[in-house]
Each structure stands twice: as C-alpha cells, then as structure tokens.
Amino acid sequence: MAKRKIVKKKVVKKNIAKGIVYISATFNNTMVTVTDEMGNAIAWSSAGSLGFKGSKKSTPYAAQQAVEDALNKAKEHGIKEVGIKVQGPGSGRETAVKSVGAMEGIKVTFLKDITPLAHNGCRPPKRRRV
C-alpha cells in the first residue's frame, strides 16, 4: 500500500503595516485577534489555546501570554502600528493592554473600550453567594 502524502497549506506572508488588536477579556478566558484595517484576521490567540486549563485561563499572566503570542504571529506579516479595542470585564484586561504597549517594534495608535452596555435589556444572572 502506498502512503499518501499530507500536503500542508503554505502560509502566505502578507505585508501589512497597520492593524487592530481586539482583546476580548471574559470571566473565563482572554481571546486576542489581530486584524488589518479592513477587519480581516491576520493572527489570533487565546489563553486556552496556549495550554492554560480551567481557572488558570482567566489569570492576567495567561492574558499576557496570549497577547504576546498573537503579536509575534502578526509581526511575521509586517505589523508595526496597532490600535487596541478592548471588550469585556475580565481580569486579564489591563495586563493585556499593557503588554501590547510593551511589545518591542509595535507602536500603539489608539485605545478604545467596546464593551457592550445594556440599556435595561435582559435580566442579568443572580449574584453569587460564596
């Protein structure tokens, strides 16, 4: 029997200078997506995809690692300037924003909070009693 060759799709390097970093910080995880100015995804990462399990996904350290991973992938495509859009109430939110600013070779142009706020919409879940 002849073995089948597995052909991997070659990653096309795009040359994009400006982009937007979307940081979604939920209570359970932190997701980071780097897009170009049109909104096409270039690179993404999350605390869960880096191997953090359970309650460790929601830590600020996991958020920092997710940002660094996503931006290192985006640097391969030539990203030099980014704007930051942050969404959600998670604990890794501030750490993620700081680690974008601390990345070498990446200039931050703007910072915007896009957390959706309900104007008396659905009833929120009941408060936890611990």
Swiss-Prot record:
For the keyword Transit peptide, the answer is no
Q: Which InterPro entries match?
A: Ribosomal_uS11, Ribosomal_uS11_bac-type, Ribosomal_uS11_CS, Ribosomal_uS11_sf
Query: GO cellular component annotations, sorted alphabetically?
Result: ribonucleoprotein complex; ribosome
Top-rank taxon, per record: Bacteria
GO MF, one annotated term = structural constituent of ribosome
Q: Name one Pfam family in it.
A: Ribosomal_S11
Q: Mind listing the UniProt keywords for this protein, alphabetically?
A: Ribonucleoprotein, Ribosomal protein, RNA-binding, rRNA-binding
- Per the UniProt entry, what is one GO biological process? translation
* The keyword Transcription regulation is annotated on this UniProt entry: no
> What does this protein's UniProt record list under function?
Located on the platform of the 30S subunit, it bridges several disparate RNA helices of the 16S rRNA. Forms part of the Shine-Dalgarno cleft in the 70S ribosome.
Its assembly, as annotated, is:
Part of the 30S ribosomal subunit. Interacts with proteins S7 and S18. Binds to IF-3.
As for family, the record states: Belongs to the universal ribosomal protein uS11 family.
Question: What is the designated name of this protein?
Answer: Small ribosomal subunit protein uS11
Originating gene? rpsK
